[in-house]
Amino acid sequence: MGNSSCCLRTRSSSGEDKSYNNDGQYIRTNQVEFQYVNQVFPRDETSTNFLPHISEREVTEGYEEDPSTNPTARPTFMERSKSEMKLKDNRRSCYMLDALAAGGHHPGILPRSLRKSSSCSTIYIDDSTVSQPHLKNTIKCISLAIYYHISNRKNRGHERLMEIFEERLHPIFRDPIPPEQMTRDPDHRNIYRFVRNLFSSAQLTAECAIITLVYIERLLNYAEMDLCPSNWRRVVLGSIMLASKVWDDQAVWNVDYCQILRDTNVDDMNELERRFLECLDFNIEVPSSVYAKYYFDLRTLALANDLQLPIQPLYKERAQRLEALSRVFEDKIQSSSLPKRARSAEHLVFEHPAVLS
């Protein structure tokens, strides 16, 4: 795809610290070495006029099981959070058994431990749908998925990194970040505050948040890199910039993000977006089946972490309101996909200047 660079992380035996290099060739801090190795990926010698369309491209070998393109593959964040979800289910089961055993002595514990289930006569549902997800709840789930990517990364201590996403070399805040924060996993609340700030300032939608997570996992798979404390902000920022332009189709310029993150500059944002696209092999397509899969898996993640919205019985007026929200979204999609009608020449009406004699 062109010039790119990765970073190999190894432990250092000496205790000396070295300052950062502007060219990103060598970094050592807190007894951790970072050595950037420049790599050149082969570029096909074909003209841009003969580049195939995204739908006509052949699937690259090894990407058939990519969850961001294959609707049958399980998302990566679900695999990373599997152990935590199982542990929480075991704790919840033990809690319910204790509540059942002490139900006579603590009558208030048992009702809270049980969940309402739908029946033939009553359906319990929240206000989030696949076409209109709940924004705040979706951002919480996205932040939790990013947290699991960082905390349960496979190559801990030997992370595969890329220079353009490293906050050591391309900081987005003027105040220097303490070195210990570059090696310590962030709290999911810090991730939520960072993502919420970008979404609220840029006025992005909940659908854009789901596409953001799809692009993050596609980047980690295509570039074969890891999400870690030193690069997660720039990875999330690049994914949000791309998702806001592709999915929402809004006139969001990169300079707008510089106004949100006032310590950044436009050149850095442009380079971040360009390199992000190169790592994705310019594959920005998200099928509807993949989008729906991520939506329902995020709901599963929310349920396992007690982040689900309060459910209420589905009565007639509420059902009509949810249907109206879905129809508005459906009409918007259908109207944009319909071809515009053209008038034939015989039905054209021309205006001629009147000649008064």
Swiss-Prot record:
CDD domains: CYCLIN_CCNY_like. It holds the Pfam family Cyclin_N. Keywords: Cell cycle, Cell division, Cell projection, Cyclin, Cytoplasm, Neurogenesis, Transport. Disruption phenotype: Abnormal localization of synaptic vesicle components and active zone proteins in the cell body and in the dentrite of DA9 motor neuron. In L4 mutants, incomplete elimination of ventral rab-3-positive synaptic vesicles and small reduction in the formation of dorsal rab-3-positive synaptic vesicles in DD motor neurons, although formation of ventral synapses at the L1 stage is normal. No other phenotype except a slightly smaller progeny size. Signal peptide: none annotated. Residues 1-13 have a biased composition (Polar residues). Gene3D superfamilies: Cyclin-like. GO terms for biological process: anterograde axonal transport; cell division; negative regulation of synapse assembly; nervous system development; regulation of canonical Wnt signaling pathway; regulation of neuron remodeling; regulation of terminal button organization; synaptic vesicle transport. Residues 186-284 form the Cyclin N-terminal domain. It is found in: Cytoplasm; Cell projection, Dendrite; Cell projection, Axon. In association with pct-1, regulates the trafficking of synaptic vesicle precursors in DA motor neurons by promoting anterograde trafficking to the axon and preventing dynein-dependent trafficking to the dendrite. May also regulate synaptic vesicle trafficking in DD motor neurons and in RIA interneurons. Involved in synapse formation during DD motor neuron remodeling by disassembling ventral presynaptic structures. May activate cdk-5. This is Cyclin-Y. It comes from Caenorhabditis elegans. The lineage of its organism: Eukaryota, Metazoa, Ecdysozoa, Nematoda, Chromadorea. The gene is cyy-1.
